[in-house]
A protein has these predicted regions:
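Hydrophobic transmembrane alpha-helices of multi-pass small-molecule transport proteins
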Residues: 48, 69, 75, 100, ...
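Specific transmembrane alpha-helical segments of multi-pass solute transporters/efflux pumps
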Residues: 16, 20-21, 49-98, 134, ...
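Membrane-interface helix-cap regions at the ends of transmembrane helices
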Residues: 23-26, 30, 44-61, 127-143, ...
Length: 299
C-alpha cells in the first residue's frame, strides 16, 4: 500500500471517529452509558472476531488475554468518561477535549521517563491549556462537570495508548490483543450495566442506528482499517490526520445537532487544535533538517 492511500484510509477512520461523538449522543437518548458501552464493544468484538476467527484461535494465549483484559478495562474507563461527559457538554467540546490525549501522552512519558519535555511540547501544552480555559470556563459556573469527565477520558486514553505500546511489543500478534480488548471492554460494560443500570436494547430506530454505527463502523471497521493503514505511513502524518477528529466532531455537531460555539469557544478550540498539532509536528524533520541530539523526550 502506498503512503498516500494509507493516509486517505486514516482520513476515513478520522471521519468515523469524529462522527462517534454524535452517535454516542444519540445512543444516550435510548440507553444508559454503561449499557451503550456494552452494546458497542460487544457487537464490535463479535464482528471483528468473526473476521479474524482463525487468527484468534492460533495466537490467543494467557499473556494476550492478560494484556487485553487490562487494556479493555482502561478502554471501558475512557468511554465511560466520555459518555458521562456527553450528558453535560456538547459533542464539539467533547471532541476538542478528547484531542488532549495527543498532549497527555508525551507529558506522561516525560514525567514517568524522567526526561525533559521538548520546547514545542511545552508550548503546545500551554496553548492547549489556554484553549481549554476559553472553551470550557463559564462566567457564572466555571468549568462544567461534563467537560471534566471528557478531560479525564483524554487522560485515561493517553494511559491506554502508552500501555498498548508496551503490550504489542511483547506480543507476536498485536491484532489479537486489539480484538480481545474490545470483548473485555464490552464485558466490563455489561457488568457495570447489571450493577448500576437496567440492561435493555434500544427502543427506537435512531438508537439502533447509533449502536450499529458505533460498533460496526466506528469500532470494528475503524480499528481494522487503522491497523492496516498505519504501518504504511509515518507516526507524524497519522497523528496530524487524527488531530482533525475534533474538527469532524464539531462539523457533525453543527450539521445534525445544531450545536454552535461562541467566538470565545471557537478561539479556544483553535488553540487546542494548534497546541495538539504543534506537539505532534516536527518542523525540522518535515523540512529535511538535521537536529542536534538533545536530552529531551520525543514529543
Amino acid at each position: 500500500m502506498k503512503p498516500f492511500k494509507a493516509n486517505v484510509i486514516i482520513m476515513i477512520v478520522t471521519l468515523f471517529w469524529g462522527s462517534s461523538y454524535l452517535f454516542m449522543k444519540l445512543g444516550l437518548d435510548s440507553v444508559q452509558p454503561f449499557n451503550l458501552i456494552a452494546l458497542r464493544f460487544g457487537l464490535a468484538f463479535i464482528a471483528a472476531g468473526v473476521l479474524f476467527a482463525g487468527r484468534l484461535r492460533r495466537n490467543t494465549n494467557v499473556s494476550v488475554l492478560k494484556h487485553a483484559a487490562l487494556l479493555g478495562f482502561i478502554l471501558f474507563g475512557v468511554f465511560a468518561s466520555i459518555m458521562l461527559g456527553l450528558q453535560g457538554t456538547s459533542t464539539s467540546n467533547a471532541g476538542f477535549l478528547m484531542s488532549l490525549t495527543v498532549i497527555f501522552v508525551p507529558v506522561l512519558s516525560a514525567v514517568f521517563g524522567k526526561t525533559l519535555p521538548s520546547r514545542r511540547l511545552v508550548l503546545g501544552v500551554l496553548l492547549a491549556m489556554t484553549g481549554i480555559g476559553l472553551l470550557t470556563l463559564r462566567p457564572q459556573s466555571g468549568i462544567g462537570l461534563g467537560d471534566l469527565w471528557c478531560i479525564l477520558g483524554a487522560l485515561l486514553f493517553a494511559v491506554h495508548m502508552m500501555l498498548t505500546g508496551r503490550a504489542v511489543k511483547k506480543s507476536p500478534d498485536p491484532l489479537c490483543i486489539g480484538i480481545w480488548q474490545l470483548g473485555f471492554a464490552g464485558a466490563f460494560g455489561l457488568a457495570f450495566t447489571v450493577l448500576w443500570e437496567t440492561p435493555r436494547l434500544p427502543g427506537s430506530i435512531s438508537g439502533w442506528v447509533a449502536v450499529l454505527a458505533l460498533s460496526l463502523v466506528c469500532s470494528a471497521l475503524g480499528f481494522i482499517l487503522q491497523t492496516m493503514a498505519q504501518q504504511y505511513t509515518t507516526a507524524t502524518q497519522a497523528g496530524l490526520i487524527f488531530a482533525l477528529e475534533p474538527v469532524v466532531a464539531a462539523v457533525f455537531g453543527l450539521l445534525f445537532m445544531n450545536e454552535t460555539m461562541s467566538v470565545q469557544g471557537y478561539v479556544g478550540a483553535g488553540l487546542v487544535l494548534f497546541g495538539v498539532a504543534l506537539s505532534e509536528l516536527n518542523v525540522s524533520r518535515l523540512l529535511g533538517r538535521k537536529k542536534q541530539p538533545r536530552h529531551e523526550a520525543a514529543g
